[in-house]
A protein has these predicted regions:
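Short C-terminal boundary/hinge segments that cap the last helix of small helical domains
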Residues: 54-66
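A short, Lys/Arg-rich alpha-helix, primarily the initiator
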Residues: 1-16, 23
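Short, basic-rich loop-to-helix N-cap that marks the start of a DNA-contacting helix
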Residues: 38-50
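Recognition helix of helix-turn-helix/homeodomain-like DNA-binding domains
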Residues: 26-41
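Append "Primarily bacterial transcriptional regulators
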Residues: 20-21, 31
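Short, charged amphipathic recognition helices of the HTH superfamily
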Residues: 15-18, 45
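Alpha-helical residues within the helix-turn-helix
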Residues: 22, 51
């Protein structure tokens, strides 16, 4: 997973981690742990993040499956 690209995408979309956490139904602290590689992002969470950040399929594949 390319966490730096994911973090850049969050900023690019003008969102904070708290805003993204709300959008995907997670606690902010949980999302912070996932973004700092202490916990894995699940497939379901990746799908919700993809929608919240308006990613194309190609962007999501590049970020989550690389």
């Amino acid at each position: 997973m390319k966490l730096n690209k994911l973090k850049a995408r969050i900023i690019e979309k003008g969102m904070s981690v708290e805003m993204l956490a709300d959008a995907i139904g997670k606690e902010r602290s949980t999302l912070y742990r996932k973004l700092n590689n202490f916990e894995k992002i699940t497939i379901g969470e990746a799908a919700k993040i993809k929608v919240a950040l308006e990613m194309t399929d190609e962007d999501a594949i590049d970020i989550f499956l690389s």
